[in-house]
Amino acid sequence: MRSLVTACASLWAVILLEIPQVRCEMKEAELNMAPWSFDDQYSGCEDRMAEKISSTGLLETELNNDGKFKEAWQKAEQTWGERKRNGTIPALPPGFTDEHGIAILVYTGAFYYRLNEAVRWVGVSPQDYMETFPYKALHYYLTRALQLLEKNCFGGCQTVYRGAKNIHFTPSSGKGSTIRFGQFTSTSLKKDVALFFGNDSFFTIKTCLGACIASMAALVTENEVLIPPYEIFNVTNFNKDEHTFVLTSTEMRCSNYNCTYLGGGKPNACGHAGKKPSPWFCGVDSPGWVPVVLGQC
């Protein structure tokens, strides 16, 4: 009997060795000002951009060009309609349309990765954005949704949390660095929710431009606050051994682009003006490593 058990154990060990082992390798990424991010705030052209999307059929074209995007939009559109009929959507700010709500549902569903993957790198040039970025309408609707909801969120700033697995982030200049996420960044008001997504890198963030989208997100239980690509943070604390961060909003924003789809170019300078609601623009002369979304494999 013992020899039979030993033989079986040996056979099982061989079988295990033959099975490909799936393992996520730890990634390394630097946090900086995300210079190649597409970070348009549509300042001063909010209505004109909406009219342009409508008159050119831009959204319909992009949906027809991407089956997964179309599927995600149609599913979100159905969910948004059901929530409106059920009365589960809270009072919305003036100017907030169905497209804004649907964009939030698309992003927080299964589409955040695709959008952010494009957003992080398509800011190389206006031409690159115009010719290769497949989610121009979605980017506009999501950006505007956050801007409209921002004022209704906290009435000020709020502490949120973000966890990531299989990736170690490092600030470009250590403690005291100035950074942007350069993408739409999901966070939670609850620390335990953020820890569920990982703690290989963990962020405690004071955001002043993030928008409370919990009641409109695909999963309402995550207490989600979504931070726009252009909010600027100071790294006020960084533990390089545990890869934990404390980020504090500067209450300023920085964009390399504005009204690009309508012909706007790249500004040459970044002006900072405290808490004013107008945009601030940042000129970029050198490349940098843009952070990854979650680092999951």
Residue locations for each model-derived region?
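Short coil/turn segments at secondary-structure boundaries
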Residues: 174, 199-200, 216-218, 259-260
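Compact beta-sheet-dominated globular domain cores
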Residues: 219-274
